[in-house]
Amino acid sequence: MSKPKILFICVHNSARSQMAEAFLNDICGAELEAQSAGLEPGTLNPLVVEVMREVGLDLSQNKTQAVFDVFKSGQLFTYVITVCSEAEAGGCPIFPGPTQRLHWPFPDPSKVEGTREEKLEKIRQIREAILARVEQFCAETCIRLS
């Protein structure tokens, strides 16, 4: 039996969805498989790459991908989780199909302001919030699968 697939979606697939994908695959990749995509794929946020490297996860070689391309591939997902902020919720893409949809609002790292160090600190806070939510999801989901 194949592992249940999880798709994390945000606007650009440059930060939040990438972090969530990396954490899920790291924490419970033996039971679940995560991917991520965005409405308008961009380039990875270098500050996100930096803060993820701090916790031992290297995103530097990751590519961004479009939700539409994932949809066209015909893959089926058990869960589709949007990670856009509440302010962006209207522009956060939806993924059709027989999936369970969840919304985990997180602030957009590309919109944080301040000095480089202040931005890094704010992105670390977002990273930790995403990590906590993924850990909770993995614990709940893996219990249901066993």
Describe the predicted segments one by one:
Residues 82-83, 103:
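Redox-cofactor binding/interface segments in oxidoreductases and associated redox assembly factors
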Residues 38, 42, 70, 85, ...:
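Residue-level signal for alpha-helical context at structural boundaries
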Residues 1-71:
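Conserved active-site segments centered on acidic
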Residues 26, 54, 83, 131-132:
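Generic detector of well-ordered secondary structure
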Residues 78:
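Conserved acidic residues
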Residues 88-146:
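Phosphate-binding/catalytic loops
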Residues 14, 85-88:
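Short glycine-rich anion-binding loops that position phosphate/pyrophosphate groups of nucleotides
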